Amino acid sequence: MTKDNAKPMRCEGCPAYDWGEGFVTPENQGQPTKFALIGQGPGEVEARYGRPFHPSAPAGRTLSRWLSAAELGREEALITNIVWCWLPATRTNGLPKGNREPTQAEITHCRSRHLDPLLKEEGYHNESSFIVAVGAPATRSLTKGEGSMERYMGSMQRIPSSDLT
């Protein structure tokens, strides 16, 4: 890891505490932003640099293309994830490899300790907030897992503010 991104004390008790790598804090926290963008979780590159959707990571390159197509800059979004540490799929010779989807217990812990307080602090806890969920885990987490992904793709959903605090 090239950045001091050790897990804070509030991560203790998380089912992924001993498995997860690094700790990736939100980008543009404390800055005025137009929308929040929430992904599944950091990958290896993001964990190494402590930056969500790092521009040199596959997901970061995709996000850069999306934002460019929408004529938006990274600075216009609060960029974060539903889990804030990298969840490697396996370990080979002690080295983490790949990515795995977070469990519901990991999502619940990270949301209650990190994401939900962040959204409230940044003003994204009301029904007029604009939040973009990227991927199935983030979408399921924010919509309480109701329905299939096809129901949500390319659409806007109203999420009760009580589900965001």
Indicate where each model-derived feature is located:
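A polyanion-binding, active-site-adjacent surface
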Residues: 1-165
